[in-house]
């Protein structure tokens, strides 16, 4: 019976694709004739599991997948590029047969996505093919909106880190105005779906909401700026390392992007954020420690710091974060974004078993010196120990990861990813790697967070004297990365410290070559301490 249904679907698709109106496609299945893959969604009979069949059609063998995972098919008028958005039609189908078909504009999103074969996309829903007006709709139980992301998750070996981390954040943090805005969320929700683009099977994506005024429930612009939203895109003002003058005719300022209000150009005014940045960078200790909580929500600052450090998120203290304010009289708060370089992964998806060091920026560098009885450090210690018993522990996180992994495995996601992208293979050892990493990371944080105030992450390396070079470090100055070449393969630990003696990053490896990414580091002079086979070498490295 299954084969009969499949043959009907294939036959109809083969002879009727051109004759059908684009907005009349059923959307319940997709066919890739090059990769010989058919993916269909639909509610399975009770007790039935998702399955795969090999089928011979017209002398060719196709892989036929059937699951209850949603299916998204996209057809565009031309190739999808970074900008401008290209017109097309999107069909979003769930297993119950509900299909939503919309005109949309599509473009590639994300800087890193440009270099990968599997692209991430931004989807803007249009009222018609002109794109003159936007159109809201709700997909797969998510909010109603006209702006969506399709995340490729290319640099996530298990295709789950970003999703699980966002769910963990929303378990952990509640917006301070939640009672006034019950629909507001401090993060984004994500739903997995199979995706076809112009009849090419692209694998499994995460359809995600966007971080914006609607998601956060910020007060609307009414001629006066009330709720505001900025996005940090790198070092500079977002890391409190520079304070150039702003220009209110521009929607960017020193690696900040103005997100909301966006009703008109006259709504842009960087003065308030500039003043806060100036306060953090230049206020005296007495002024800073007595007044910072009146400008930035202290509970949010604590939760964000503990969350990012529990993940050891490599790229979320100046880049990939949002700064928001609910209304004019509210304090600022941080919200995370793009949580893929976490839990022992670098930004390119490679494993970096780095469990020591504290993620920070100029704001947190000062907060972690707040040694008052009810200051940041004391409050963060109390909050950390509460969370260790509930959410921030290996058992809870691995339960979330395992449940998500099992769901993806049962639905055949990893098999389909391999068919779409043959270089991809799932490695169950990644679960063991993550579990061990969490154990080591929390062991480190237990000692560090509960240490005396003013000591977090601070270690002073002792240089060794002698002419023998164990390690070659280049380039110096460095811009994007520091390359480290050891004389021979050996167990090595490399630690990078800033000028205050704070441990910024550490790496362990057994290879002859190691790369330390620096794009999220502030400009300045760093101390690189390499320990190889019981010997130590100290180098000064300039990051530009």
Spans of features found by a protein language model:
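C-terminal outer-membrane/trafficking sorting elements
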Residues: 18, 465-474, 478-544
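Internal "kinase-insert"/substrate-recognition segments embedded within catalytic cores
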Residues: 127-132, 136-155, 159, 171, ...
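Regulatory N- and C-terminal appendages and interdomain linkers associated
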Residues: 20-107, 395, 399-402, 407-457
């Amino acid at each position: 019976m299954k084969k009969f249904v499949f043959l009907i679907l294939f036959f109809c698709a083969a002879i009727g694709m051109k004759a059908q109106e684009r907005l009349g496609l059923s959307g319940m299945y997709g066919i890739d004739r090059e990769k010989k893959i058919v993916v269909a969604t639909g509610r399975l009979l009770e007790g039935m599991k998702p399955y795969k069949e090999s089928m011979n059609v017209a002398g060719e063998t196709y892989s036929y997948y059937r699951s209850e995972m949603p299916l998204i098919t996209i057809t565009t008028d031309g190739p999808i590029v970074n900008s401008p958005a290209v017109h097309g039609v999107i069909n979003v189908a769930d297993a119950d047969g509900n299909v939503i078909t919309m005109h949309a504009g599509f473009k590639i999103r994300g800087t890193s996505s440009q270099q990968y074969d599997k692209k991430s996309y931004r989807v803007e829903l249009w009222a018609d093919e002109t794109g003159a007006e936007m159109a809201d709709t709700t997909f797969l139980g998510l909010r109603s909106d006209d702006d969506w992301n399709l995340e490729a998750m290319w640099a996530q070996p298990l295709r789950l880190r970003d999703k699980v981390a966002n769910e963990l954040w929303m378990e952990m943090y509640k917006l301070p105005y939640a009672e006034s805005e019950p629909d507001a969320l401090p993060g984004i929700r994500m739903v997995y779906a199979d995706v076809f683009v112009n009849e090419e099977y692209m694998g499994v994506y995460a359809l995600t909401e966007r971080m914006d005024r609607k998601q956060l429930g910020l007060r609307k612009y009414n001629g006066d700026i009330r709720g505001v939203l900025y996005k940090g895109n790198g070092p500079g003002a977002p890391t409190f390392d520079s304070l150039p003058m702003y220009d209110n005719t521009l929607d960017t300022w020193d690696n900040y992007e103005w997100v909301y209000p966006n009703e008109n150009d006259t709504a842009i005014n960087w003065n308030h954020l500039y003043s806060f940045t100036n306060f953090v960078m230049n206020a005296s200790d007495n002024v800073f420690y007595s007044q910072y909580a009146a400008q930035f929500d202290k509970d949010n600052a604590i939760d964000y710091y503990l969350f990012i450090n529990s993940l050891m998120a490599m790229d979320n203290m100046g880049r990939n974060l949002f700064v928001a304010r609910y209304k004019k009289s509210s304090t600022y708060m941080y919200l995370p974004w793009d949580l893929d370089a976490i839990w022992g992964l670098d930004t390119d998806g490679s494993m970096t078993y780095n469990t020591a060091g504290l993620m920070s920026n100029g704001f947190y560098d000062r907060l972690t010196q707040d040694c008052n009885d009810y200051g940041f450090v004391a409050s963060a210690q109390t909050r950390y120990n509460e969370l260790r018993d509930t959410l921030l522990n290996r058992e809870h996180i691995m339960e979330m990861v395992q449940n998500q992994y099992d769901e993806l495995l049962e639905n055949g996601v990893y098999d389909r990813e391999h068919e779409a992208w043959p270089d991809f293979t799932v490695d169950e050892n990644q679960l063991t790697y993550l579990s061990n990493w969490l154990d080591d990371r929390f062991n480190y944080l237990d000692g560090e967070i509960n240490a005396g105030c003013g000591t977090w992450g601070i270690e002073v390396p002792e240089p060794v004297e002698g002419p023998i070079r164990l390690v070659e470090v280049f380039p110096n100055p460095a811009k994007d990365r520091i390359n480290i070449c050891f004389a021979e393969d050996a167990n090595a630990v490399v630690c990078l410290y800033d000028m205050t003696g704070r441990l910024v990053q550490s790496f362990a490896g057994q290879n002859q070559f190691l790369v330390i990414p620096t794009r999220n580091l502030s400009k300045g002079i760093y101390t690189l301490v390499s320990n190889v086979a019981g010997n130590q070498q100290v180098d000064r490295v300039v990051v530009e």
